């Protein structure tokens, strides 16, 4: 088959640098996905390979240049996750036009100056819902950014003085363990369950700032059982791993919503750790609440996974095993 070389001009070297990413990540990713070679010479990208693949890769480079020119968050380079997503869009025959809008959207900027925002079309829908809904449900597999983006939205609301505090909670029923049967005092017992929430907070705020906010009770992390009997006003409240809440716990949690507050419920319906035969409160809510004004449901899928590519393949393999009729 005939090999050709296609020249794609870069508007300027800064745009070319942003497109190439850290350590030429973009070039290496595109070369791995499509059998072509890419070089940057005299302000032009040279794409070489078999005609069909070279044209496809050149078209993709052109679209990526448009995305970068359209204004990346904080003028940062394309990340590997951004490029993987754009590659999937291009390989699926979809335009990356919407990516321009998505990749310039910043939900919050971390203490270290890193802009945080959506990285897939599903995440963009989720971020939009987080901004406008009083109560938002995000349902989807691991790695889709459900928890991280919810915590980012909470930090943004706190910084903008839209809420006075952040409350993060999880049901303490994982891997068949219940708090009462675990050794140690309460803090030691609940800490491992809530660790992912701490991790997200420490990533968005620095350790020192987060510690001060915990001390002043501006941020509170507690097991779901500790929400009973409270009315949560002027707060951004997140229920994480909601698939492990019972129907009664879910109803109890949702009715804690107070004035000036917002609630986000995240979980993966396929991963429940509840005893066999007990319906997940998240599943029940997804059946009962759609259509209620003020409540938004966002469903994220494997195409929204922004972790390692292998995580996406693992999710696809399990999906295929559990739902063979869909494949």
Name these PLM-found stretches.
Residues 28, 32-43:
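Compact, well-ordered interaction domains used in eukaryotic information-processing assemblies
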Residues 1-18:
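Short glycine-/aliphatic-rich beta-strand segments at the starts of folded cytosolic domains
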């Amino acid at each position: 088959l005939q090999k050709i070389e296609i020249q794609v001009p870069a508007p300027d070297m800064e745009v070319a640098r942003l497109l190439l990413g850290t350590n030429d990540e973009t070039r290496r990713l595109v070369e791995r996905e499509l059998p072509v070679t890419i070089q940057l010479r005299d302000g032009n990208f040279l794409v070489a390979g078999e005609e069909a693949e070279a044209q496809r890769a050149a078209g993709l480079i052109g679209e990526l240049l448009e995305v970068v020119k359209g204004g990346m968050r904080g003028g940062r380079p394309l990340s590997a996750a951004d490029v993987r997503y754009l590659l999937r869009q291009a390989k699926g025959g979809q335009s990356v036009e919407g990516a321009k809008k998505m990749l310039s959207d910043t939900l919050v900027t971390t203490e270290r100056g890193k802009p945080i925002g959506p990285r897939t079309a599903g995440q963009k829908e989720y971020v939009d819902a987080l901004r406008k809904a009083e109560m938002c449900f995000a349902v989807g597999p691991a790695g889709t950014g459900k928890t991280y983006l919810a915590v980012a939205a909470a930090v943004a609301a706190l910084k903008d003085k839209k809420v006075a505090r952040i409350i993060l909670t999880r049901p303490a029923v994982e891997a068949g363990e219940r708090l009462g049967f675990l050794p140690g005092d309460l803090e030691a017992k609940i800490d491992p369950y809530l660790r992912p929430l701490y991790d997200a907070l420490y990533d968005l705020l620095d350790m020192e700032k987060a510690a001060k906010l915990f001390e002043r009770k501006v941020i509170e992390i507690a097991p779901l059982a500790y929400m009973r009997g409270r009315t949560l006003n002027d707060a951004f409240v997140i229920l994480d791993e909601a698939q492990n809440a019972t129907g009664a716990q879910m109803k109890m949690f949702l009715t804690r919503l107070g004035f000036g507050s917002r609630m986000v419920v995240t979980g993966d319906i396929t991963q429940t750790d509840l005893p066999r035969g007990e319906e997940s409160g998240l599943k029940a809510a997804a059946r009962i609440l759609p259509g209620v004004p003020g409540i938004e449901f966002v469903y994220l899928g494997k195409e929204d996974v922004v972790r390692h590519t292998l995580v996406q393949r693992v999710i696809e393999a399990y999906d295929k095993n559990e739902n063979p009729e869909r494949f």
